[in-house]
Regions:
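Non-catalytic helical tethers at domain boundaries
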Residues: 1-140
Length: 140
């Protein structure tokens, strides 16, 4: 007997939509200069949950995009990088790309590869710059 996981897609899509809405609200209310550790943990958990579900269903663009976001959020919550407004703006932009990817997967379409590549490159630059200790504002 083979399990058809497509029957669980709608549940994943609904949960991912809720997690993205929660992530957006937390990011919009985040005090960049002194972020609440609980808020950072909640934002990280939202990204982590979306990534896990996306990987389970084989939504590779969503998995890959969320993985990079998650790694930056993990470093932020572990005090391994200092958040900047540019980072939070990039996280919000990523949330929009993830929302678009969900819409595409829900419609059985492939997500916009160029949009994913653009946001992933931006996140990777932020990740590299924060690892090097250079100001994130230099990325603009």
């Amino acid at each position: 007997m083979t399990l058809d996981i497509t029957q669980f897609y709608q549940t994943f899509f609904d949960e991912a939509d809720e997690l993205l809405a929660q992530m957006e609200q937390l990011l919009l209310n985040l005090d960049v200069g002194s972020p609440d550790p609980e808020d950072l943990a909640a934002i990280f958990r939202a990204a982590h949950s979306i990534k896990g579900g996306a990987a389970t269903f084989g939504f590779s663009a969503l998995t890959d995009t969320t993985h990079i976001l998650e790694s930056l959020l993990d470093r932020a919550r572990n005090h391994e990088l200092t958040l900047t407004k540019e980072m939070v703006d990039a996280f919000l932009e990523t949330k929009d790309v993830l929302s678009d990817q969900l819409v595409d997967y829900r419609a059985s379409a492939e997500p916009d590869a160029a949009a994913a590549a653009t946001i992933c490159a931006k996140l990777e630059r932020l990740k590299a710059e924060s690892a090097a200790g250079a100001p994130a504002a230099a990325l603009r």
